[in-house]
């Protein structure tokens, strides 16, 4: 069964959700993200997706204290993104307890640097963030667009051993309108050696079941979980031995 990965987006140390990546649309769900993380862990979740939205805008991680608390108080494997654009920032994220680091803008602006990281670290610890708006990869906290498509960006790093990609359909992010299942199935088919993680638009377990039928291996769920459309019991159904 496809793995569900809860999303925890952080602004000012609090757990929030945005719509279309618009910072002005934020809604706070937990003042202490650790509370959410503990609930997910209790439900049997293994991975947590954490995005430092302050860091994405500032071009450097800004909520490492939140990461440190969750890493220290839970056994969750945290994948952390937002503002990781230097080797120092990457090390700080790992030192704070992240199991994996998500890199997007740096892979577009400094592909040689990201390729070097794939060579230096276990490629399984680095996730390429290939988030798309109108077919183009968006960068800098989704505030700018590049000239690359997701397949073009992913293809650059296959020779370096890339194994994991998170692809968010920004047009559907926070909209609870269902994912672009055909798009993701095509992307997974093009890159069979890479785990393509779906993100954006998930509204129900039916959406997730369709992605599972299409051969996707993991999916990030945010607003549907916080709004109660998908429950903790639903999460438990997707555990490996459920």
Label the predicted regions.
Residues 54, 60-121:
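Glycine/small-residue-rich loop that forms an oxyanion/phosphate-binding "nest" at active or ligand-binding sites
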Residues 74, 78-100, 182-218:
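Catalytic cores of alpha/beta
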Residues 61-68, 143-152, 177-185:
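Charged helix-capping and loop-helix junction motifs
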Residues 9, 40, 48, 93, ...:
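Conserved, mostly hydrophobic/aromatic
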Residues 12-25, 91, 98-173:
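Conserved anion-binding
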Residues 92-113, 169-172, 200-207, 214-234:
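Glycine-rich phosphate-binding active-site loops on the catalytic face of alpha/beta enzymes
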Residues 49-52, 79, 102-103, 127, ...:
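Conserved beta-strand positions in the central sheet of alpha/beta enzyme cores
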Residues 47-65, 105, 167-177:
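Glycine-rich, proline-tolerant flexible connector loops at the mouths of alpha/beta enzymes
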């Amino acid at each position: 069964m496809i793995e569900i990965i809860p999303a925890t987006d952080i602004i000012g140390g609090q757990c929030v959700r945005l719509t279309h990546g618009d910072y002005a649309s934020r809604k706070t769900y937990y003042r202490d993200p650790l509370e959410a993380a503990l609930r997910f862990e209790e439900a049997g979740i293994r991975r947590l997706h954490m995005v430092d939205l302050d860091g994405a805008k500032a071009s450097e991680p800004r909520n490492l204290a939140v990461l440190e608390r969750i890493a220290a108080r839970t056994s969750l494997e945290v994948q952390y993104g937002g503002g990781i654009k230097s080797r120092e920032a990457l090390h700080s994220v790992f030192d704070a307890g992240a199991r994996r680091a998500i890199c997007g803008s740096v892979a577009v602006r400094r592909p040689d640097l990201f390729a070097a990281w794939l060579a230096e670290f276990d490629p399984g610890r680095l996730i390429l963030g290939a988030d798309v708006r109108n077919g183009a990869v968006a960068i800098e906290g989704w505030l700018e667009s590049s000239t690359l498509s997701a397949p073009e960006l992913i293809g650059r790093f296959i020779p370096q051993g890339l194994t994991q990609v998170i692809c968010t359909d920004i047009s559907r992010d926070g909209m609870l309108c269902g994912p672009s299942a055909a798009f993701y199935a095509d992307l997974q088919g093009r890159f069979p050696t890479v785990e393509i993680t779906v993100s954006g638009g998930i509204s129900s377990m039916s959406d997730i079941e369709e992605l599972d039928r299409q051969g996707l291996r993991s999916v990030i769920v945010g607003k549907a979980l916080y709004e109660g459309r998908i429950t903790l019991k639903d999460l438990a159904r997707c555990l490996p031995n459920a």
